[in-house]
UniProtKB/Swiss-Prot annotation:
It comes from Penicillium aethiopicum. Residues 1714-1743 have a biased composition (Low complexity). This is Non-reducing polyketide synthase vrtA. It comes from the Eukaryota. The lineage of its organism: Eukaryota, Fungi, Dikarya, Ascomycota, Pezizomycotina. Pathway: Secondary metabolite biosynthesis; terpenoid biosynthesis. The gene is vrtA. Residues 935-1259 are annotated as: Malonyl-CoA:ACP transacylase (MAT) domain.
């Protein structure tokens, strides 16, 4: 006992922690705590709140996915408290206790810090009391000797409390099905006016009367003198109060206890407490002694524990098993106060006043009336104002870079190729490619030409226009107008995320709302130059910089911040710094960061050159004496950054760790663009100080290093002075290595910083420093001379950079902006990881693994499969477990999927080879956009298996916990444990019917929860016999406790009342009618009695009855070849044997609460589907036990109701997949999955089923499957996604970037210069004038060229072939161009080829090219060709091009192909037919000699030609002709002059081939008076040897009418012979008959306006200029049919021999439009011939013969095709507008086009309301 003087100094003190919140606004209290925690005076409060949140985040992360995924993000207590208790997630008890602990201990700590008082509670005079959860707060204080210890102990007590709440809530949900969301039902009521004894007596009687099983009893949880609290499941409490008049009429109130039971000794045991304490992972030392005593709320005396672990155990035990006696608490407190007789006062700390606290005060005052009570309210301080806040230090977490991707110059299209470029010391510098801009016109080294570049050099990435638009849900038009920087930013962002294994939402740190993007961009070349040539719909979202990051966030659905940053040359590094800052500030948990730069605008070259930034001699010469400026470069880079602790928790591969970052500005520089050494040093020192790193620890600095005299000198000074000072000097082992990536790839400007960072990351990864190649002559003399003394310098060859043993490498990356900004990043090695393994033989103990590959397109899927196979071939030692983890858990899964289950790498390789060889990608069906329905099927007793193998139980703690929890319920209900049965015990008791049936139900309920953990949630349930009980639990009709009680009691009653094996059951493969027919016709069984117990399928019937009868039936059926299988069960359920069971079962069930199902129940008792809460009741269970199992009827009803379909996945949740076997028979196309299977490992079965679900579109939560052992797996760096790319590129045409400089002189440029006048690199002929794109890969080549028909040689060639006094291009011109391009590209790919033999195939020309008579105008054409060497095939398409804008038309006017073939095959073919051709020639000559055939002279021949075409002298190669009807032979002599640069001059080709045209337009067998004949093209043109100048040839042809065309079309083969040997053939040249009256219409010269502005002859006034695109080629747009009358069917080409008539690009018109299309008809058929030259203004109406899609609906679809640049074949009925890239902007464009062109008014929302093509077509058909 204390001395009286000590009592005066230290009066008795009580700290009381109740179980109620203060009456204040709790959210406001939390807000106040949060505000104060930001003040430096409340550091411990801040620490406690942060520690508490970390504990809760950690605990939430451990919850099952279906719960944690719905927990809103929280990063502080205010965020969490404002979301409430989350009762609908089953977290009410856990969250309520957490809030109370955080509030109480936060207020306690803050109360002390507010007055700067340390914790000083004398042990002898202080005691701590708590009520219920408040005991954990009391424990935290009792275990702490200081406030700092309260922080740690409080957080860990919070952990135990939260876990206890989760456990109690989870366990309680098994006692009674959860209430519907939003409804609260109390689990406790307080009763006043009755004694504890009378209440207990009444409860004992009521529990017995209601038949409440042990787990559902109503019991006393708390008591005092005036009240008693009773607890139990809400429905049981309600029933008890209704059953007992004493309770019903007592004064009672429900308590706010909504989340389960505590204080229940009959439910919980010490095992439950031990489970909570084991999984809580408390950090409080188990042996920590008490500081203060804690009074028990049950006994009123201090707990007897002596250590921390014992105290927490006793508190937890009291909470779950101990009854609260308030009187004992009060007596214990009064006893403590009275222990100090000399005391004049006592101090009591509490949180406001409650009823219980008032009782404590009254008791003290009564027993000690002379004692002064000093009340200290721990809440008051929080409302005080403490003046100006003193800010805490910001967070300094280390950050982890976990993913990267890039496109760099020099062909470095991924990070591996980038490293190869660096390691090999390659220089990526080149001249500006022609697809960027034309150097010949835009480069002037003298600087005299305004706006011209003064240097031709740069560093450029490959294929900047190539993009997978469909993957990113963009239409071709949107993709084309979108800046390539935007496109490649999102591509590299995806690739970096893929490398990082970042699956959005996989973990707490990867939630969508916690990911942001930060990119640097400093130019808008595409918007300012390329796209501005024809500003389209997507000019703003496709070109404005902010959309670069906006597009990333939008596509990935990230709602975190997105910032586009422009700090000139340091933009990307500033963006990385911004991302790091956001992570340090807690704004995001994951940051995508990077930079972009694509160069297309010569203006920036001019500007930088005029400012003397650029080197006139080439690459950046960093630290070279001749450094003369930087060399521009392109680059795209992305990285993924996370906090280090998150990356480690998420099992990420960490490339490097960011220690700190800083940015400042050279404010003291001599000019804004001049660097300043002092500020650079400041920035470097700042990052070192923030990280606590010595400069001597830094072993590498990646310099900004631009290769300028000033920049290199100043940066070298700043770097060396900071990191390699003269005092103290670096030790010999502390070499400082330096380097600069710009010496390899130039200055990427906005992408420079990210290029340097990725190089740095690669160095960490490769453990090497690549050589510096910047010094081309000698070291810059301005640099420090003492590098040796400083132990610093460059590396000139690849040098090992190894991680020191037990230490980390530290490096610095510098990036400076021309505007004066400096950004510095400090990095270190990733933490070392040590591989864990379950066993030496296996990573995770599993024998089979799921491997998944997916894509969004079939081409990409095939590519991804090939890439994976290639990876395995390069890495044969790949760990299959890691590969499975990577492809399943760490990949985003797309709609096209291939997956398999394998046990070895070799088996996987075999599967992949087979898939690739069979081209499986073409047959894979896309998974449905809507998740298919999933039905859980629960098998009955027939599937019982002795022991479910232990893999699931051992490997999945969540499954094990569920089984053990359910087993505890089983034992509490008085039944034996089922765990031995599940583990395969053969003990007699284990094999009893009670245990057998309970083990099945426990297994099935646990499996249902396990599947839910894996993300598979049922849409409906169906149970077979016993399995229906488990189905009812999953559907929420019955609680788990009630189900187990009913099943156990039913089994007990059956055992008691029925004779085992007196009856039996028999499964028969026959219908009931077949069985009855066989049984009744056999005398031995004609009178036996049996029942149909189960109708499983139409031909699978289970019979039941007396054992002897069933055995007799079996013998009869087997003799008639019916398959029979006796069921090994002791009782015959669903037969008369159950008659003695059902009455008692129904009585027991009457005391059970039944609820409406939360999901449909396919009732096998009723053969229907149950939705309501009335149908399933005690009577239902009675009938279910006795009646027939109507499995077939239940399934068929569900199908009729639309609940299931062919896409439904059926998951069997039993010991063996019996029920899904029935489903397979009822619906063979159904997908089925099993949970367990006899004679197969559980994990193998589960893995196969997961793959089945995955392929069906019910994507599992793969991460949960790997989660129990996640740390043993490694994320593999697999090949990146195989993109299905198309080139979307708008070339800059003309010289208007230069021309605008003339305006200030009053000179107005007249149009753009003709492409023909622009010299270009590469191929150049008389018809090919400028190369706009040339890409050469190993096996493919692409060439885009521009030509001008008005160029002299081209114009002359066209005018050599005039029709109707117009120069019309002959198809020989297109043939020559095809041959020229074909040989050019082929030799690029096969330079060693001696000869190139080409077959020009499938030439088709839709629109004749009529040359304008206006002098000085331009008529540009575009030709696009792509050669595939594997296919030996090249495709070609010709387009009209807008002379003003340079944009090509969206549709081609001509197309062809070139096949590269073996000429030996030609010779063999022609040798077989040569004698026949020579025979016909000889016959014609004889007929001419006999006067039967006509011999025609050269002059007469070309006079006949003039009926249609007038050839110039060049083309007149025919010397004479013999003609007989449609057959002719001609002697030909080619003129010697080539008249230009050609592959094969067109006038030579025409001379040897146009005999066919002479027959059709000059033969007396042809009606040339009314018609002329034009050719749509030919099938093939082959020449064995080049045509020779002046050489003599023979041409022979016979034309035949095509029967399908009814005389309107003729075709023939033109044979070309030299010296009576066939040397060439023009196969199947076709001619179509056209009424002569249409000659003027088709062949009128274009107007000056049309030719000079639109660049296409006769463009109609209503037609918009053609859209520029280099997207995938499209089929030509069909034109409006005109009434039948005079025009041949399908005519499209106008050329007496090789000339094509043109179609208009006008769309069909409505009756209310002024501009129409004139037409004529032919008696045979309708036609679509129109002319682009036609400007007729008469309206016509389309014919009624058009098919469904050529009316208004078809016109709408064509507009959609045209405006999106999508091929018509892509517009299938099921194609969604979202997939096609039709966004809100495109919707507006389409609705406007519909209105303007078709006269129909539709809202743009139509494409949202009708999301597919088919729905839009139907809507238009019905409403327009």
């Amino acid at each position: 006992m204390l001395h009286p003087t000590e009592v005066e100094k230290f009066p008795p003190t009580l700290l009381y922690f109740g179980n109620e919140f203060p009456n204040d606004d709790v959210n406001e209290l939390f807000r106040r705590l949060q505000q104060h925690s930001k003040d430096r005076r409340f550091r411990l409060l801040n620490a406690y709140l942060e520690e508490s949140i970390l504990v809760l985040q950690d605990e939430v992360a451990k919850l099952p996915h279906h719960i944690k995924s719905r927990v809103p993000y929280f990063d502080n207590i205010v965020t969490l408290s404002e979301h409430g208790y989350l009762r609908d997630l089953g977290l009410g008890a856990a969250m309520e206790s957490a809030f109370l602990l955080i509030l109480q201990l936060g207020l306690f700590i803050g109360n002390h810090e507010a007055v700067d008082r340390e914790l000083n509670l004398p042990k002898n005079v202080t005691t701590v009391a708590g009520l219920s959860v408040g005991l954990f707060s009391a424990a935290a204080i009792a275990l702490s000797a200081s406030l700092a210890e309260v922080v740690r102990n409080g957080a860990e007590c919070l952990r135990v409390s939260f876990r206890l709440g989760v456990y109690a809530g989870d366990f309680s949900s098994s006692l009674e099905a959860p209430q519907p969301e939003g409804m609260l039902a109390s689990w406790a009521h307080v009763v006043t006016g009755m004694t504890e004894e009378s209440v207990q007596s009444e409860l004992t009687r009521v529990n017995e009367d209601l038949g409440n099983p042990e787990t559902s009893k109503v019991f006393i949880s708390a008591a005092d003198k005036s009240s008693v609290s009773v607890s139990g499941p809400p429905s049981r409490i309600k029933a008890a109060f209704l059953q007992s008049s004493d309770l019903r009429y007592s004064k009672s109130l429900p308590l706010p206890v909504y989340d389960g039971l505590c204080h229940a000794t009959h439910i919980y045991s010490q095992d439950d407490v031990n489970t909570v304490l084991e999984i809580s992972e408390s950090l409080i030392p188990a042996t920590r002694p008490f500081q203060l005593s804690v009074i028990s709320s049950r006994t009123g005396v201090p707990f007897t524990a002596t250590t921390a672990s014992d105290l927490l155990s006793e508190i937890a035990t009291e909470l779950v098993m101990g009854t609260i006696y308030l009187d004992n608490i009060i007596e214990g407190i009064v006893r403590h106060i009275g222990a100090f007789p000399g005391a004049q006062s006592c101090r009591i700390d509490s949180f406001r006043t409650s009823i219980i606290f008032k009782g404590i005060l009254e008791a003290i005052a009564t027993d000690h009336p002379d004692l002064t009570i000093e009340k200290n309210d721990l809440v008051d301080w929080v409302h005080q104002d403490f003046g100006t806040r003193r800010r805490n230090d910001p967070a300094n977490s280390k950050l982890a870079i976990v993913g990267m991707a890039c496109r760099m110059p020099g062909g470095a299209n991924n990070v591996e190729e980038f490293w190869q470029l660096l390691e090999q010391g390659r220089d990526a510098c080149t001249t500006v490619p022609p697809d960027r801009f034309d150097l010949e016109t835009h480069y002037d080294p003298t600087g005299k030409t305004e706006n011209a570049a003064q240097t031709p050099y740069g560093n450029f990435i490959d294929r900047p226009g190539y993009f997978d638009a469909a993957f990113f849900a963009m239409s071709p038009k949107e993709a084309e107008q979108t800046d390539p920087m935007q496109r490649l930013a999102i591509v590299t962002a995806y690739e970096a995320m893929e490398m990082a294994g970042l699956v959005i939402g996989r973990t707490q740190s990867t939630r969508r709302d916690r990911i942001g993007s930060y990119y640097g961009q400093a130019s808008d070349d595409w918007r300012e130059l390329n796209a501005s040539q024809n500003i389209g719909t997507y000019a703003v979202p496709g070109g404005v910089r902010g959309f670069t990051v906006g597009r990333i966030n939008y596509f990935f659905k990230l709602s975190g911040p997105c910032l586009c940053i422009d700090t000139a040359c340091s933009s990307s590094m500033a963006a990385v710094h911004a991302a790091c800052t956001a992570l340090w500030a807690g704004d995001v948990d994951v940051a995508l960061a990077g930079g972009v730069n694509i160069i297309t605008d010569p203006d920036n070259y001019a500007g930088l050159g005029n400012a003397h930034f650029l080197s006139p001699t080439g690459q950046c010469k960093v630290w070279d004496k001749g450094a003369d400026g930087y060399c521009r470069a392109e680059g795209i880079g992305s990285v993924v950054i996370k906090r280090l602790e998150d990356a480690e928790a998420d099992n990420d591969n960490i490339l490097a760790v960011v220690l700190s970052a800083a940015t400042n500005h050279c404010a003291d520089a001599i000019s804004i663009t001049h660097p300043h050494a002092g500020h650079q040093k400041d920035n470097c020192r700042r990052v070192l100080r923030k990280a606590g790193v010595s400069p001597m620890q830094v072993s590498y600095v990646e310099m900004h290093g631009t290769g300028t005299q000033a920049g290199d000198a100043i940066e070298s000074e700043s770097v060396l002075d900071v990191f390699a000072p003269l005092k103290p000097l670096r030790r010999p082992d502390q070499r400082l290595h330096l380097g600069a990536v710009k010496s390899n790839i130039g200055h990427g400007e906005a992408a420079a910083g990210i290029s340097s960072l990725i190089k740095m990351l690669l160095m960490f990864q490769k453990n090497a420093i690549p050589p510096h190649i910047g010094i081309r002559t000698e070291m810059n003399p301005q640099l420090p001379k003492d590098l040796g003394r400083r132990n610093a310098g460059l590396v000139f060859e690849t040098t090992p950079w190894l991680r020191p043993e037990g230490k980390k490498r530290i490096s610095v990356v510098n990036s400076f902006g021309a505007h004066g900004g400096n950004t510095t990043l400090l990095l270190e090695d990733a933490p070392e990881r040590h591989r864990q393994r379950i066993s030496p033989e296996s990573t995770d103990g599993r024998s089979v693994y799921a491997i998944s590959v997916s894509a969004k397109s079939k081409k990409s899927l095939q590519g991804n499969l090939s890439s994976l196979l290639g990876y395995l071939e390069q890495h044969p030692d790949t760990d299959l477990a890691d590969l499975s983890y990577t492809t399943c858990a760490r990949r985003t899964h797309h709609n096209l999927r291939v997956a398999t289950v394998v046990s070895s790498v070799s088996a996987l390789q075999k599967f992949l080879r087979s898939a690739i060889d069979s081209n499986i990608a073409t047959t894979v069906q896309s998974v449905p956009s809507n998740i298919p329905s999933v039905v859980f099927t629960f098998t009955g007793q027939g599937a019982s298996d002795r022991g479910v193998r232990q893999e699931l139980f051992d490997d999945f703690p969540a499954f094990r916990t569920q089984v053990l929890q359910l087993d505890q319920l089983v034992q509490r209900l008085g039944f034996p444990s089922v765990v031995p049965a599940l583990r395969g015990s053969t003990d007699e008791e284990v094999l009893s019917p009670v245990v057998s049936q309970l083990s099945i139900v426990v297994l099935e309920i646990a499996l249902s929860r396990f599947w839910r953990l894996l993300g598979i949630r049922p849409s409906a349930v169906i149970g077979h016999s016993l399995g229906e009980y488990a189905a009812l639990e999953v559907a929420g009709v019955l609680s788990a406790a009630d189900v187990l009680y009913l099943v156990g009691r039913r089994a007990q009653i059956t055992e008691q009342r029925c004779t085992p094996y007196g009856h039996s059951m028999l499964s028969v493969l026959a219908t009931p009618d077949e069985i009855d027919r066989v049984v009744r016709r056999v005398p031995e069984t004609s009178n036996v009695e049996y029942e149909v117990s189960c109708q499983n399928t139409h031909e699978d019937t289970v019979l039941g009855g007396a054992k002897a009868d069933i055995e007799a039936i079996r013998k009869v059926l087997e003799t008639t070849s019916y398959k029979c299988v006796p069921l090994a069960i002791p009782f015959a359920y669903h037969t008369s044997q159950m008659d003695v069971v059902v009455d008692e079962l129904e009585e027991i069930a009457k005391n059970i609460p039944f609820k409406a199902p939360s999901i449909p129940v396919l009732s096998t008792m009723l053969g229907t589907v149950v939705f309501d809460g009335k149908t399933i009741n005690p009577t239902y269970l009675r009938r279910q036990t006795r009646g027939t199992v109507k499995f077939v009827a239940a399934v068929e009803t569900a199908r009729d109701l639309g609940l299931i379909d062919e896409k439904t996945v059926w998951v069997d949740l039993g010991p063996h997949p019996v029920c899904v076997g029935f489903i397979r028979k009822l619906s063979p196309e159904s997908r089925i999955a099993a949970s367990c299977r006899r004679n197969e490992e559980n994990l193998s079965t589960i893995t196969k089923s997961l793959v089945t679900l995955h392929l069906a579109g019910a994507t599992p939560l793969w991460n949960e499957f790997f989660r129990p052992n996640e740390q043993v797996y490694r994320l593999l760096n697999l090949p990146k996604y195989s993109w299905n790319e198309t080139n979307y590129w708008i070339p800059y045409l003309g010289t208007w970037a230069l021309d605008k400089a003339l305006l200030k002189y009053g000179i107005t440029p007249v149009g753009a210069k003709a492409p023909a006048t622009l010299p270009a690199a590469g191929l150049r002929t008389s018809t090919i004038h400028q190369t706009t794109l040339e890409t050469i890969d190993s096996m493919t080549a692409t060439l885009h060229v521009l030509s001008d028909m008005q160029a002299p040689e081209f114009r002359a060639a066209v005018y050599g072939h005039t029709m109707n006094n117009c120069g019309v291009a002959t198809s020989s011109i297109w043939t020559d161009m095809a041959l020229a391009v074909g040989e050019y590209l082929y030799r690029k790919l096969v330079p060693q080829a001696k000869e190139v033999h080409m077959n020009v195939c499938d030439l088709e020309v839709l629109h004749a090219q009529v040359i304008s008579k206006v002098k000085g105008c331009s008529q540009p054409l575009a030709l696009e060709a792509h050669l595939d060497l594997d296919m030996q095939y090249m495709s070609l398409k010709w387009y009209n091009t807008n002379a003003a804008t340079g944009e090509r038309a969206p549709e081609w006017f001509a197309s062809a192909a070139v096949r590269f073939e073996n000429p030996d095959a030609w010779t063999a073919e022609w040798n077989r037919t040569g004698h026949l051709v020579l025979g016909r020639i000889e016959t014609l000559r004889r007929l001419a000699a006999d006067g039967v055939a006509n011999r025609i002279s050269k002059r007469l021949a070309y006079t006949l030609f003039k009926n249609v075409v007038d050839y110039s002298d060049w083309y007149r190669g025919i010397d004479d002709v013999i003609m007989n009807d449609y057959e002719a032979v001609a002697n030909v002599t080619l003129i010697p002059d080539r008249h230009g640069t050609w592959h094969t001059p067109p006038h030579w080709i025409d001379s040897v081939c146009h005999l066919a045209g002479l027959i059709m337009n000059g033969s007396d067998a042809s009606n040339t008076q009314d018609f002329f004949y034009v050719t749509p093209g030919s099938d093939s043109f082959r020449l064995l040897k080049p045509l020779a100048p002046g050489a003599k040839y023979i041409s022979y042809v016979r034309m035949f009418p095509l029967s399908a065309e009814a005389g309107n079309m003729y075709a023939g083969d033109v044979y070309i012979l030299k010296d009576d040997v066939i040397v060439g053939v023009l196969c199947q040249i076709r001619f179509r008959r056209v009424p002569r009256l249409l000659m003027d219409r088709f062949f009128s010269p274009p107007t000056a306006d049309n030719a000079g502005v639109h660049g296409t002859p006769g463009s109609q006034r209503s037609q918009a200029p053609p859209a520029a695109t280099h997207a995938a080629t499209k089929s030509p747009q069909k034109t409006l049919q005109v009434p039948s009358g005079h025009v041949p069917n399908k005519a499209s080409i106008v050329d007496t021999n090789h000339v094509q008539a043109s179609h208009p690009s006008a769309v069909p018109v409505r009756h209310d439009q002024s501009n129409g299309v004139s037409g004529v008809s032919d008696s045979d058929s309708s036609t679509s011939i129109t002319s682009s030259n036609s400007t007729a203004d008469t309206s016509t109406t389309p014919t009624e013969s058009e098919d469904a899609d050529s009316g208004l609906v078809g016109q709408c679809i064509k507009i959609i095709s045209r405006e999106t640049n999508l091929d018509m074949s892509e517009l299938t009925p099921d194609a969604t507008f979202a997939q096609l890239g039709v966004d809100s902007l495109m919707s507006l464009v389409l609705s406007e086009k519909f209105r303007n062109e078709l006269g129909i008014d539709v809202k743009s929302s139509l494409f949202l309301e009708c999301p597919t093509i088919g729905e839009v077509k139907e809507w238009i058909d019905q409403n327009c």
